């Protein structure tokens, strides 16, 4: 069975084609700068070198058409025709409480999803454009929606209800949803596989640390709490997002700086976090280099980031009633020895001890805790695309 996985962003489309017989990636790449000058498609067949094609891409549909053309190209392609694609899996950011698991697209699902686009206005509309393009270009091929939020639908009420007037929850469905669910789901299953224990027996804290970052408490294989909230703005300090702050601060700043709701939203989402504190960059590598050169604000930014993660680890250790495994994943989690060290330093009383030598690992699966560490600490590169492909196979198999 061959599965195409699509992840449509505001100006990009990431794609991968899997042969699910052995979960091998046949081709992958990225269409970027959609609707802008300098648009292009990066294409890689198997493990061959990447090729870059400069192509005008005015719309997401055009980008997907060009991706399909490359997939069946007689020189570069991997398919004799698009009919070889058995199903398409779409990454969708927000399913609200309407979708508690991955679903096959039909008229009812399509219309329900269309009704919750405003839950993630920067993401869901573009996810839908990907679905629309595939329905038009590949009629009859099953389309599956895989939601970032669905893994967290197992949270208990006390974890997801905000202390606001309850009628706001009833009227607007304002509650914690959480994100990066596909990543947290994948690494929790993968680490259980690597240590040879059923995931249902483990207490896991999963740290997805990238430009966007979240942390999840996983008990008996299920998410019981997560740091992101109604939107991806809540929780950890991120590349450009503030994470947890006193809710009165935006109101105060709107008055003092004469800012509109849109302007304050822009500041909290795109000008805060590591970038806001350091004044250097939203890229942790740049901030790390600046800190090494003595930039005090860059150093402070990394300390604030690590401190917040550490607080969440402590909180989740408490609600889990102990901890078996701590997992680091995503860009910083996988490739940030400094950040991992800052986070784990001082957590020895919780049974977390890093091996300094093993902690130098970047981008590989490895247990980085010491032999006498009560908690196993792992680096697990995330693979959301593979998880989406697996979910697609599972859902289509139910049909």
UniProtKB/Swiss-Prot annotation:
**Listed pathway(s):** Metabolic intermediate biosynthesis; acetyl-CoA biosynthesis; acetyl-CoA from acetate: step 1/2
Any single GO molecular-function term of the entry would be:
acetate kinase activity
Cofactors named for this entry: Mg(2+); Mn(2+)
The principal localisation class reads cytoplasm
| Compartment(s) | Cytoplasm
The cofactor remark states:
Mg(2+). Can also accept Mn(2+).
Q: Which residues form the active site?
A: 148 (proton donor/acceptor)
- UniProt keyword annotation of Nucleotide-binding present: yes
* EC class: transferase
- Transition state stabilizer, annotated site positions: 180, 241
- Annotated binding of ATP, by residue: 14, 208-212, 283-285
Q: Where does Mg(2+) bind?
A: 7, 384
| E.C. designation(s) | 2.7.2.1
Q: Which GO terms describe its cellular component?
A: cytoplasm
List the Pfam families. Acetate_kinase
**Family, similarity comment:** Belongs to the acetokinase family.
Q: What is this protein called?
A: Acetate kinase
Write down the species. Answer: Dictyoglomus thermophilum (strain ATCC 35947 / DSM 3960 / H-6-12)
């Amino acid at each position: 069975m061959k599965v195409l996985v699509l992840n449509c962003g505001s100006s990009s489309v990431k794609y991968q084609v899997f042969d699910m017989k052995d979960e091998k990636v046949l081709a992958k790449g990225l269409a970027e700068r959609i609707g802008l000058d300098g648009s292009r498609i990066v294409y890689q067949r198997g493990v061959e070198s990447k090729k870059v094609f400069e192509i005008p891409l005015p719309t997401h549909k055009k980008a997907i058409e060009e991706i399909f053309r490359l997939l069946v190209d007689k020189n570069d392609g991997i398919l004799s025709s698009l009919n070889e694609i058995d199903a398409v899996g779409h990454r969708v950011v927000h399913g609200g409480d309407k979708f508690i698991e991955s679903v096959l697209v039909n008229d009812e699902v399509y219309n329900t999803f269309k009704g919750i686009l405003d839950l993630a206005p920067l993401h869901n509309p573009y996810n839908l454009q990907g679905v629309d393009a595939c329905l038009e270009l590949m009629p009859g091929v099953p389309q599956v929606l895989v939601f970032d939020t669905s893994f967290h639908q197992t949270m208990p009420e006390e974890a997801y209800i905000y202390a606001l007037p309850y009628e706001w929850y009833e009227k607007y469905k304002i509650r914690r949803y959480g994100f990066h669910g596909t990543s947290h789901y994948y690494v929790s299953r993968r680490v259980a596989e690597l240590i040879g224990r059923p995931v249902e027996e483990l207490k896991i804290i999963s740290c997805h640390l990238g430009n966007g970052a979240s942390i999840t408490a996983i008990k008996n294989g299920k998410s019981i709490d997560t740091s992101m909230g109604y939107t991806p703005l809540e929780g950890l300090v991120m590349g450009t997002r503030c994470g947890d702050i006193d809710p009165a601060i935006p109101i105060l700043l709107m008055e003092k700086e004469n800012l509109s709701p849109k302007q304050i939203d822009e500041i909290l989402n795109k000008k805060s976090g590591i970038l806001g504190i350091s004044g250097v960059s939203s890229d942790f590598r740049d901030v790390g280099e600046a800190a090494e050169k003595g930039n005090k604000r860059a150093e402070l930014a990394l300390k604030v980031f690590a401190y917040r993660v550490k607080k969440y680890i402590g909180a989740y250790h408490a609600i889990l009633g102990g901890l078996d495994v701590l997992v680091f994943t995503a860009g910083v989690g996988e490739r940030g020895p400094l950040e991992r060290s800052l986070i784990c330093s001082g957590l020895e009383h919780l049974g977390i001890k890093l091996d300094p030598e093993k902690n130098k690992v970047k981008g590989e699966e490895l247990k980085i805790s010491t032999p006498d560490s009560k908690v196993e600490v792992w680096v697990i590169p995330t693979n959301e695309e593979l998880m989406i492909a697996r979910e697609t196979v599972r859902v289509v198999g139910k049909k």
